[in-house]
Every structure is written in C-alpha cells, then in structure tokens.
Amino acid sequence: MRRLALAAALIAAVALSLSPLTTGTALAQTAPATANRGLTPAEVGAWITGLGGRVGPVQTENGQTFFAVTNAGLTWAVFFYGCEAGVCGEVQFSAVVPGAGATLDKVNAWNRDNRYLKAFHTSAETPTATVQYDVVVLSGGGVAQLADPLAVWLQLLPKFAGEMGYVAP
C-alpha cells in the first residue's frame, strides 16, 4: 500500500514538473473566432419580400433601424436591436393599430388572454394600441430561424387588430 502511494506521488511530481504551467512557458492559445450573432436588415427584408410581403427601405431614425412591411391589408414594422457592424442580434415585429376601438380595457384583455404578442395602449385624440413581438436571433441560423416567429406574428396580428376594432381598408 505504501509503495502504491509512493508511486502515485512520484508520477504526480514528474507530471507537474513537465507541465507548462510550472515551467513558466505557458502555451499561447488563440480564442476561437466568434460567429456574428444575428442578421442584417437587408437579408431579413429580402426574405420577407420573397415570402410576398411589400418591404419598404431600411431606415434609421433616433438610433433605431427598421423597415415597414405591408401585408394582407396591415402595415407593420421590423425593428433591429443589438446591432454590431450591421448585424443585429434581436428583431422586433411591431404594429400600431389606430381607432376608437383601441381601449385600455381591450389591450389589457389581450395581454391577459393571449401569449407571445405584448401590447400597450396610448391615449390621444385618436387612441392607438401597439403590439410587439420580440425575437432573439441565434448564430448561424440565418433568416430561416424567423420562420416560426413570423408565422406566429402573421397569425396573431390580424386577430389583435380585429379585437381592437380595426377594419382593413
């Protein structure tokens, strides 16, 4: 038993003496390249156009990058957040629904009874209800990763607009 403990101690001492950490010559390592986490507004716009949406030009106002989309009688916007070098890590679908039917009670009922899309009410001469859906973009997924969130958005946006009393022209 004593021999085994002695042999283990000897092996550990030899291994430690050969370690680059104890000789002062640590091996340099290169950090792995980080993939861009996100999508560009141009590729998201091209993708939505390919799906049949009418996409407006990319705009930047007050530090926010976005474009408008018209589809099925509704106009909504895609906002981009967490952008570095033109690649954005978060996307937000957003729509403003105007009309006297957009009451605080209806917006609160929406938030209570529905998942995924969040909404808020703005009192003004013409009250509005704004609805939003936030999406975190993953590395390497490309625009295809927006397929399910866009399907949820396109399914629930008309429902929200209808519940707020909006009738498409």
Regions found by a protein language model. Name each.
Residues 35, 89-130:
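Short, internal acidic amphipathic alpha-helical interface segments
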Residues 14-25:
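C-terminal segment of classical bacterial N-terminal signal peptides
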